[in-house]
Amino acid sequence: ERDCRVSSFRVKENFDKARFAGTWYAMAKKDPEGLFLQDNIVAEFSVDENGHMSATAKGRVRLLNNWDVCADMVGTFTDTEDPAKFKMKYWGVASFLQKGNDDHWIIDTDYETFAVQYSCRLLNLDGTCADSYSFVFARDPSGFSPEVQKIVRQRQEELCLARQYRLIPHNGYCDGKSERNIL
């Protein structure tokens, strides 16, 4: 029987922000409740000279069911006692996008090919998660080797999210576009 209490989930040991920095392509995601980036999602993580991590992300969002825009999101990360667990404050460059302050956990990464991120926004009384989201990131938008896919699938199962992810297309929709020159 798998333990699905969020407090039991393991994260990346000795997580190294500096090695994690750079460009990551979202290959799959498990959605939370509410408006969220849909596809063509690319995140850029950076670490400043004081060791503070921040990120920008771009992706396609569908508004009002039929209006597609490329949205820019910004996030700042506050460290916690565990180097792989952050509080992420995020907001959209445009006011209609979601903003919030979520847990942002790096469940696993090899820094070179893949990363699995997890966030629980709301706990059930039994300690399991009522509203979570998770991204599988790749350094290369063409995806993973079978060996890496196996590790990623295992991590998804450990998060009690097996078969709840959908693949994210990268078809160039947002290349060179941002909401500033679409809206």
UniProtKB/Swiss-Prot annotation:
GO MF annotations, alphabetized: retinal binding; retinol binding; retinol transmembrane transporter activity
Top-level taxon in the UniProt lineage: Eukaryota
Sequence positions that bind substrate: Q98
Compartments, as annotated in UniProt: Secreted
Modified residues (Omega-N-methylarginine): R121
Membership in a protein family: Belongs to the calycin superfamily. Lipocalin family.
Protein name in the entry: Retinol-binding protein 4
Source species taxonomy: Eukaryota, Metazoa, Chordata, Craniata, Vertebrata
Encoding gene (name): RBP4
